[in-house]
Amino acid sequence: MRKTMVISDLPHEIESEILSRVPTKSLAKLHTTCKRWYALFRDPRFVKKNFGKSERRLMLHSNFGVYKITDDLHGILNSGDPSLEFTSKLSNLKISEDLTITKIFHCDGLILCSTKENTRLVVWNPCTGQTRWIKPSKRYRSDDSYCLGYVNSKSSYHNYKILRYCFYYNDQDACVSEFEIYDFSSESWRVLDDYCTREWGLFCHGMSLKGNTYFVAGEKETGFFMLYFDFKTERFERLPLPYQSFDSEDTAVLSIVGGEKLAVLHQNIQSFSNEMRIWVTNKIDEAKDLTWSNFFLAVDYDIFNLPSVNNVTSFLLDEENKVAVCCDRHIDDEDKTRIYIVGVDLYKEVYKERTKGAHFNWPLLISYLPSLVHIQEKYPKDKRKGNKRRLVKRIT
């Protein structure tokens, strides 16, 4: 009888090559099939090779929850009557109660979630279900913000770190800046003293690109500029923006394009023009090599009879179709979270919901690639505290 060859009979190199081409979400369901595959799917070289084999997914943080959107970006844009469908609220991060998630930050398939009052932090892989809980700094404040990044490693797991930052006025009415780093390998927080006297402010949600975080920042003397934090050197560096502005009321938002580029959306609130503009960078290998396109997209909101102030909090860009999917918080007779598609001659609202909670609960729309990346685990302490790290239900 002729023997049928199965994948386990193949040489390891060929087996690995075949599996690396399988969509990531399918592999996540197979990781417990056998010990060999379990080890392979945790190999950083295999994870890097497989990254990008699945379609991008959309996720919305709104009303203190995180929601999965059914379609990807192209599915929404190609629909004859586009609208967003939410399959489920991602409540699988709970331990004994539903968590109030106040902020999220995306970094290469991992989501950093901040809970109410920043009393707990959790890093979560929505593809594999793995989580790691992080104890906040002893200096933490309820208005802290956090970014997740890493130091790139070609041969081993990335060394992940968390940047904590906050700005506040002390008893002498002086502005104080605080920056701290949490290192996953040392499981500890430490202060970045060099930056406690900086006078610039951050004006948008940070965006992670290739392990580093980019912001739009500004100060009175120089106006707006782009700022990036290098998790390897643990230093901030200034980069140029494609426009000049000194008005802190302007809308300025960053987005990641295809995992290789940055885009910036700008709207001058004080000008007589009701125009939104978007620029895109070149492919970025090193931040110092960043350059901006002359111009990518300009949209005149007056054409669509829209209000002059649109509080865009996040956006996604489709370079091929030259359209943007914008998420904003619209304040008229009632406070609403909106998502709409906009282009030179296009405006289509695809989602609107009344916003709940405090004024700081800004919605955030993100696009992410499912990843098998493994979150560094804590040893050996966690073995005595199994409830601190657990697998949660995968997104299906």
Swiss-Prot record:
Q: Where is the F-box domain?
A: 4-50
Keyword Protein transport found = no
Q: Which Gene3D superfamilies match?
A: 1.20.1280.50, Kelch-type beta propeller (2.120.10.80)
Q: What is the protein named?
A: Putative F-box/kelch-repeat protein At3g17540
Give a yes or no for keyword Transferase in this entry. no
Species this protein is from: Arabidopsis thaliana (Mouse-ear cress)
What PANTHER family does its record include?
Answer: BNACNNG10540D PROTEIN, F-BOX PROTEIN CPR30-LIKE
Annotated PROSITE patterns: FBOX
The record's Kelch repeats, renumbered to this chain, cover: 163-209, 253-299, 338-386
Write out the entry's keywords from A to Z.
Kelch repeat, Repeat
